[in-house]
Swiss-Prot record:
This is Uncharacterized protein IRL6. Belongs to the HHV-5 IRL6 protein family. It comes from the Viruses. InterPro entries: HHV5_RL5A/RL6.
């Protein structure tokens, strides 16, 4: 499995793991509201986990990808399968009216 992250200034980070392993994606910023979801992947668009405020996380137990937990900075995936390859979107809303948005997309390839 290879995880590739390209941030806004085109910095590229690659992480590798093996099939059947557990994996944590970590981002260093701590926004107020976070939504993790898959996009354009083998599993289609589906939300995986939402976090609001300080540590109030809700994991989608019906997701086709195993998610053990998440936070504003992390998404913990479990028991990865080759069919779990795809894009993972980290969306953040912040600001006084929660009207400011930023996001990052990770590409995960499980082999």
């Amino acid at each position: 499995m290879t995880l590739i992250y390209v941030d806004a200034d085109n910095t590229r980070n690659e992480l590798k793991a093996t099939t059947g392993s557990n994996f944590t994606i970590t981002h260093r910023k701590d926004p107020l509201t976070t939504k993790w979801k898959t996009v354009f992947g083998n599993n289609g668009d589906q939300w995986l986990c939402n976090v609001t405020g300080i540590g109030n996380a809700t994991v989608n137990s019906n997701a086709t990808i195993c998610v053990s937990s998440c936070g504003h900075n992390t998404l913990d995936l479990c028991n990865l399968k080759s069919g779990d390859s795809g894009f993972f979107d980290l969306s953040r809303w912040f600001g006084e009216n929660m009207d400011e948005y930023s996001g990052d997309v990770w590409h995960l390839e499980v082999s």
